[in-house]
């Protein structure tokens, strides 16, 4: 909205209006505005949730400080969503297909999470939406994103970007714009993997098979990352802080992918138009950081499924549309580890019960952040006993953030490793 207004004013040579043409300027504004919005509206939304008794139901799992959380308002993810949408609607180019995809993702998963939280908190059905309905909604979003990336003529990229310096002149060369199924992967030749290579056995209809594979991978990633963020949301500030760290890296990747010079230097695909996503990423980071104002230990509000499902879905779709989705296992290492710990725990328990008649566990409790939170006696049916003493919640969260920062730095660094 404001972008269109100031673009018009700049054509009339109004002083200062040209600043809005710069993505960097609008990104700084977007971050600042989302941070301020999430801090200021947070108190009002928390009071509203308290008045309507939208408190979290806490199961007693024997964790330190758990009972004190009883009655803390949930559904605070509304704060994050509002703080993302307002700056993006004001400052981003709303005609940009990448921005539109991110708005669809935010609203789609926000509605899904809101329904789930309302069922659990307001209508007092603690199970919420059934897992099948959640998966169907996430798969539906993945299909929409994958098909739009495939069908939209506005989503193209330039491969093999090179900038040569000859004397005082620079020569830029790249392939013609094309619909590409390439994605960035560290340690591969030219840092790229083409999904087309995985369908080489399809002599007929290879192009169609490649795009079907891409859409299926999109569906899987959206579902996996969204649920991974949901599992991570068990400690005050953990998901919001981790998401902010991831958002910074995604914003950087979008910016360099839309810049010919950086794309050539890093040997990654040049994706015209995706630089506008930097404005969205800035709002995303600002909203998460502003939410921490209320959600840091001890939390005044929990984000609920409306927050965690939305944050995970945003991260997944963002990475997919800038063709960096295979960097997510490293970048989202915290989410990945949380999900993996649950799968390992369940699989080993079933295996050991079938084998010995007594189910054994790898961890004291999953997701894995609860393993560190739970101290106490040495149980014979738990393989990993350490730490024997419970680690304070705030210390676990900060340590996970530090690991997230390390993984984020490694993700960026790997772009230059051949």
UniProtKB/Swiss-Prot annotation:
Q: Tell me the compartments it is located in.
A: Cell inner membrane
Q: Which reaction does it catalyse?
A: UDP-N-acetyl-alpha-D-muramoyl-L-alanyl-gamma-D-glutamyl-meso-2,6-diaminopimeloyl-D-alanyl-D-alanine + di-trans,octa-cis-undecaprenyl phosphate = di-trans,octa-cis-undecaprenyl diphospho-N-acetyl-alpha-D-muramoyl-L-alanyl-D-glutamyl-meso-2,6-diaminopimeloyl-D-alanyl-D-alanine + UMP
Annotated GO MF terms: metal ion binding; phospho-N-acetylmuramoyl-pentapeptide-transferase activity; UDP-N-acetylmuramoyl-L-alanyl-D-glutamyl-meso-2,6-diaminopimelyl-D-alanyl-D-alanine:undecaprenyl-phosphate transferase activity
Q: Which PROSITE patterns match?
A: MRAY_1 (PS01347), MRAY_2 (PS01348)
Per the record, the pathway is: Cell wall biogenesis; peptidoglycan biosynthesis
Annotated disulfide bonds: none
Record's function text: Catalyzes the initial step of the lipid cycle reactions in the biosynthesis of the cell wall peptidoglycan: transfers peptidoglycan precursor phospho-MurNAc-pentapeptide from UDP-MurNAc-pentapeptide onto the lipid carrier undecaprenyl phosphate, yielding undecaprenyl-pyrophosphoryl-MurNAc-pentapeptide, known as lipid I.
Record HAMAP family: MraY
The UniProt family comment states: Belongs to the glycosyltransferase 4 family. MraY subfamily.
Q: Protein name, please?
A: Phospho-N-acetylmuramoyl-pentapeptide-transferase
């Amino acid at each position: 909205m404001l972008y269109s207004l100031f673009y018009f004013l700049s054509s009339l040579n109004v002083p200062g209006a040209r600043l809005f043409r710069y993505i960097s300027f609008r990104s700084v504004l977007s971050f600042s505005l989302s941070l301020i919005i999430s801090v200021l509206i947070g108190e009002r939304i928390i009071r509203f949730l308290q008045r309507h008794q939208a408190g979290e139901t806490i199961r007693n799992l024997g964790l330190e400080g758990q009972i004190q959380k009883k009655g803390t308002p949930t559904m605070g993810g509304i704060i994050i969503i509002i703080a993302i949408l307002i700056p993006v609607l004001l400052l981003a180019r709303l005609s940009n297909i990448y921005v539109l995809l991110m708005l669809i993702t935010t609203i789609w998963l926000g509605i899904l999470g809101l329904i789930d939280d309302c069922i659990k908190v307001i209508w007092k059905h603690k199970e919420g939406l059934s897992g099948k309905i959640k998966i169907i909604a996430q798969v539906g979003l993945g299909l929409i994103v994958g098909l739009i990336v495939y069908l939209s003529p506005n989503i193209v990229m330039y491969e093999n970007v090179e900038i040569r310096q000859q004397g005082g002149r620079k020569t830029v060369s790249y392939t013609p714009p094309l619909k590409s199924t390439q994605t960035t992967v560290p340690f591969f030749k030219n840092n790229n993997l083409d999904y087309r290579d995985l369908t080489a056995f399809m002599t007929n209809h290879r192009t169609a098979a490649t795009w079907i594979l891409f859409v299926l991978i999109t569906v899987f990633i959206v579902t996996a990352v969204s649920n991974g963020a949901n599992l991570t949301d068990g400690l005050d500030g953990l998901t919001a802080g981790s998401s902010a760290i991831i958002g910074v890296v995604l914003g950087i990747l979008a910016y360099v992918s839309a810049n010919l010079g950086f794309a050539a230097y890093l040997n990654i695909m040049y994706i015209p138009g995706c630089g506008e996503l930097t404005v969205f990423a800035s709002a995303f980071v600002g909203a998460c950081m502003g939410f921490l104002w209320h959600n840091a230990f001890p939390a005044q509000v929990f984000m609920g499924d409306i927050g965690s499902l939305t944050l995970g879905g945003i991260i997944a779709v963002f990475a997919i549309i800038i063709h960096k989705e295979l960097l997510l296992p490293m970048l989202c290492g915290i989410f990945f580890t949380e999900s993996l710990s649950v799968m390992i725990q369940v699989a080993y328990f079933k295996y050991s019960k079938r084998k010995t008649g007594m189910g054994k566990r790898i961890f004291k409790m999953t997701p894995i952040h609860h393993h560190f939170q739970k101290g106490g006696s040495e149980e014979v049916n738990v393989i990993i006993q350490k730490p024997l003493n419970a680690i304070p919640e705030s210390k676990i969260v900060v340590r996970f953030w530090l690991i997230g920062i390390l993984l984020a730095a490694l993700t960026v660094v790997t772009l230059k490793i051949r």
